[in-house]
Swiss-Prot record:
Database matches in InterPro entries: Trp_synth_b_CS, Trp_synth_beta, Trp_synth_beta/beta-like, TrpB-like_PALP, TrpB-like_PALP_sf
PANTHER family: TRYPTOPHAN SYNTHASE, TRYPTOPHAN SYNTHASE-RELATED
Name of encoding gene: trpB
Record's protein name: Tryptophan synthase beta chain
Residues bearing the modification N6-(pyridoxal phosphate)lysine: 98
Reaction(s) the record says it catalyses: (1S,2R)-1-C-(indol-3-yl)glycerol 3-phosphate + L-serine = D-glyceraldehyde 3-phosphate + L-tryptophan + H2O
Function description: The beta subunit is responsible for the synthesis of L-tryptophan from indole and L-serine.
Pathway terms, separated by semicolons: Amino-acid biosynthesis; L-tryptophan biosynthesis; L-tryptophan from chorismate: step 5/5
SUBUNIT field: Tetramer of two alpha and two beta chains.
Top-level taxon in the UniProt lineage: Bacteria
Amino acid sequence: MTTQLPNSFRSGPDERGHFGIFGGRFVAETLMPLILDLEKAYAGAKADPSFQREMDGYLKDYVGRPSPLYFAERLTDHLGGAKIYFKREELNHTGSHKVNNVLGQIMVARRMGKKRIIAETGAGQHGVATATLCARFGLECIVFMGAVDVERQQPNVIRMQMLGAKVVPVQSGARTLKDAMNEALRDWVTNVSDTFYCIGTAAGPHPYPMMVRDFQSIIGTETKTQMQAAEGRLPDSLVACIGGGSNALGLFHPFLDDPTVEIFGVEAAGHGLTQLHAASIAGGRPGVLHGNRTYLLMDDDGQIQEGHSISAGLDYPGIGPEHSWLHETGRVTYLSATDDEALAAFQLLSRLEGIIPALEPAHAIAKVLELAPQRPKDHLMVINLSGRGDKDIPQVAEILRGQK
């Protein structure tokens, strides 16, 4: 499908929250006043210089920004092609990019007078970031997490509990991220007066996809400045993994109107695109889920299918609506990596660079192993290393033991 190209790829969404045919706000009547209040509060925060000053202070002194742009010399030499840089989001406080967005949303929640924060989490990184900021600001925190993810991400469950959050295992459906999001939305509907729903990815009803993207765009903004300092020019290509896609949009968005920059998103191909996977663009079609229209994994009857990935953060059966639009306009190329490819990349990076990545960005690294050797040595490639792999070590160790 082709979409008429806009004057700018950075101008969306429109006033109703649409990116082309994608996005919007498909929510229960009970929630609509809340969504409109949030939109108004966020617009007010954006227009308030003191809000940005306060946020910048926390990003610097609490989160630890700017995160480094690191030249991966040994990986570059090993692949023999493009010069590879990592945007080191795994060095942020809490261990991933998630904290950038959570800080912004919690500051908006405080502005709205909300005292109770709910969140969904898959890999647990968003849950940890939310629990962390709630502890910092003295707010009640409830995190919904699929029971399957609770089992495979125990280190993060313990972290959330130590930070004072209540972790609610979700037993419905496939007991993963989609089901956790369903439960969070149900809670929100019944607790509208005092509760703020802190969504972890660039999905959900408007203004969430825009708001999450805006808070994450610091990744790409810093990368532009850092690459100019390191190489005197823009990168030639960007690569990031995609679940809902907030880490990718954070890196991509500031570069969307730079036509010389190639952009690649990497979905989770699971066991392969003809089997169990979570690649919504490669194997899905447009539909409505969790308040927005986007590409979804659906059966012939339009029922949502379960996503599968070795990575708990990528098995969502949809993708952020802006990604769907960027796919249809052709501005971003979407690829996919299997569980086995991600696992191999996880091990390779650990041994070559002394950096243990999360399984989520290991999917992006897996595609870099193919893309980089095809490009000349003066090609500058930036990968968003969106999280660290501490949370995945027990799971990976168990898989590797089983392979012996």
